[in-house]
Amino acid sequence: MTDSLSPTLELAVELIKRPSVTPHDAGCQELLSQRLQTIGFEITDLPFGEVQNFWARRGSQAPLVVFAGHTDVVPTGPEEKWEHPPFAAEVKDGVLHGRGAADMKGSLAAFMTACERFVKKHPNHRGSIGWLITSDEEGHAVNGTVKVVEYLVDKGEVIDWCIVGEPSSTHTVGDVIKNGRRGSIGATLIVKGVQGHVAYPHLADNPIHKAAPALAELANEKWDEGNAFFPATSLQISNINGGTGATNVIPGELNIMFNLRFSTELNADVIKQRSEAILQKHGLDYDIEWRLYGEPFLTSKGPLIEATQKAIKHVRGSDTTLSTSGGTSDGRFIAPTGAQVVELGPCNATIHRINEQVLVSEIDQLSSIYEHILEELLVVGSE
């Protein structure tokens, strides 16, 4: 079977067959590291807890262009509902099926073969190439990229440009690249009351009744107008839980969870201050715990955006759209170091779904795009 596969597809198949459900790596990183060592990369394994990470670098000079990605995948859901077994990596009618095909083992394979071709053609390229790989992107994301970035900062490593292999495309590979992401902050709110009998409300204090106007104001708050790169900030209440399950008992507390996806017009401190001002305005007795998942980041212009646009135009013959839509990515840990960051990967229509799949032609084209980005950044004008 493998005789008929392109090098990129062959590697993608090998990776998908390793059931690396987060935070497990299932040997994917060992496979990648061995390939990278063969073409002159120095490998540093960086395990934290049960999470596997590695940093690889070829070259010692600036500028440094880094590929960031993850080997872990989300759980499959009921395997009997898959048309093709999720870890069989079956190829049929030009489509690669399997968990991780689009998110993001196809990208890992594409960048690997791009690097192999690039190094063979340009063994004395300027600057350096790095790989930052984790098995903790789809899970808690506490022992993965964020820890590797801390290690790199402590070592004095400076990333100039970073390509994150997240599935950014919508209809065809490269039609959309992410040049930023909104910030994400979540809150767990406990509104306190006094439990009692519904027939004697004067002897109780109903936290649901007290919280309702405050929650309505939070939900309707106009946080900002957004800007040219980001939509307006959005707050969504995701969980509300209160009561004993009985109809005749006023609950003693109400538990609420909400999340804000915010633009560069705001920061986490301002969100906390404005949210709690609303809670206090309504006289609530409450406890609140905040968790910042990431500040917003943006690469509005520069060599990385230009190189990516040129590469897509060269391979696909089409222009690309810059976007900051969607959820968070590990780019949020890399951008604060000062690096320019873009996300470029396959189409995302089936990510995290049953029957995840990617067109074989997409990952082959993606490999060519990655190779041309490297040439634009590390070759053009230097040879």
Swiss-Prot record:
Its EC number is 3.5.1.18. Keywords: Amino-acid biosynthesis, Cobalt, Diaminopimelate biosynthesis, Hydrolase, Lysine biosynthesis, Metal-binding, Zinc. Zn(2+) 2 binds at D103, E138, H352. The active site is at D72, E137 (proton acceptor). Catalyzes the hydrolysis of N-succinyl-L,L-diaminopimelic acid (SDAP), forming succinate and LL-2,6-diaminopimelate (DAP), an intermediate involved in the bacterial biosynthesis of lysine and meso-diaminopimelic acid, an essential component of bacterial cell walls. Belongs to the peptidase M20A family. DapE subfamily. Homodimer. This is Succinyl-diaminopimelate desuccinylase. It comes from Hahella chejuensis (strain KCTC 2396).
